[in-house]
Amino acid sequence: MNMNIDAEVLIKEAIEARKMAYTPYSHFKVGAALLTADGKIYRGCNIENAGYTPSNCAERTAFFKAVSEGERSFAAIAIVAGPENGDLVLTAPCGVCRQVMMEFCDYETFPIILGISPNDYKIMTLKEILPLGFGPKNLNIEL
């Protein structure tokens, strides 16, 4: 992991983002903090909908906020999750979120910080959580 990335700070930001989650159905709240290459942090939370399909994950919320503001280069993401009235549990991104990361992040090295607390976390790369990922390079496109 890049030494300029402070996992504890990102986890604290993700914990704050989680407080904004809208989860009247699952009561499972997720927060994400996405670090850009130039040091900005974009927060995201999960937002549920009665139809479930239109719901959005915390990770995608953070990415879409950042991309909608012109960001295209990302250094890391921290994710925290757990039941509304319970402890945080180690939770990896869903498949759709992994695919969004594949679009914008370095497949080999992008660090994904899965947090339980600022001092208790696991770091994995995008390649580790999405083996044999399909991305722009599979289409002979260099972004």
Model-flagged regions — what are they?
Residues 29-35:
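Short beta-strand scaffold segments in enzyme catalytic cores
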Residues 26:
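Active-site segments that bind and position negatively charged phosphate/pyrophosphate groups
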Residues 8-23:
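Short, basic/aromatic recognition patches
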Residues 35-36, 115:
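Short beta-strand-to-turn element immediately C-terminal to the catalytic PLP-Schiff-base lysine
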Residues 7, 12, 95-99:
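Charged, amphipathic alpha-helical segments
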Residues 1, 5, 9, 120, ...:
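Feature of Fe-S/electron-transfer and energy-metabolism proteins
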